[in-house]
Amino acid sequence: MPSPVDASSADGGSGLGSHRRKRTTFSKGQLLELERAFAAWPYPNISTHEHLAWVTCLPEAKVQVWFQKRWAKIIKNRKSGILSPGSECPQSSCSLPDTLQQPWDPQMPGQPPPSSGTPQRTSVCRHSSCPAPGLSPRQGWEGAKAVAPWGSAGASEVHPSLERATPQTSLGSLSDLIYALAIVVNVDHS
């Protein structure tokens, strides 16, 4: 009778019961959603993980691990000197639309918001370390209105919860904002 070690060796294993985990392959759509979320909220809360899992049709654990590995990749690249600590993307090889290259601070009075044209939310950079452009968490709802393709007018007509008296800044309400924007974008494209 063969021993368990012999049986696993016959299967091509190392003989010590090692089990190689199946590697997850993400679709382009899943990666786009994850990169967008990471660019806007690099430290998502549990409800954001749950929402991303639902949107991407991935298990929540896979979403959580993706964020952990994305951060590890950034730290590794910074330590090895591939990218400078101040930027995730080498300036000479990435091009973003002008409206997304110029920072817009909604608290600055008199500063006009970015152009009213539909902004592109994907980077044309081919570096895997360059996140898709998005909102920084401190921009909150004002920043979301600035990059929304419909502008600030009309958002409440599609989804009444989009217009609020106070800016949304907590991670829980940011998750709600992502969901609401997804609804508006889906309604707008149907």
UniProtKB/Swiss-Prot annotation:
Family according to the record: Belongs to the paired homeobox family.
Residues spanning the membrane: none
Function summary: Probable transcription factor involved in the control of specification of mesoderm and endoderm.
Gene3D superfamilies given in the database record: Homeodomain-like (1.10.10.60)
Subcellular location: Nucleus
SUPFAM superfamilies with a match to the protein in the record: Homeodomain-like
GO cellular component, one term: nucleus
Gene Ontology MF terms: DNA binding; DNA-binding transcription factor activity
Protein name: Homeobox protein SEBOX
PANTHER family: HOMEOBOX PROTEIN SEBOX (PTHR47777:SF1)
Positions with biased composition (Polar residues): 89-100
CDD domains on file: homeodomain
Keywords: Developmental protein, Differentiation, DNA-binding, Homeobox, Nucleus, Transcription, Transcription regulation
Record feature DNA-binding region, as residue ranges: 19-78
Gene that encodes the chain: SEBOX
Organism of this sequence: Homo sapiens
Residue numbers spanned by region Disordered: 1-24, 82-161
InterPro entries xref list: HD (IPR001356), Homeodomain-like_sf (IPR009057), SEBOX (IPR042223)
Bias-annotated ranges (Low complexity): 1-11
Biological process according to GO: embryo development ending in birth or egg hatching; oogenesis; regulation of transcription by RNA polymerase II
Domain of life: Eukaryota
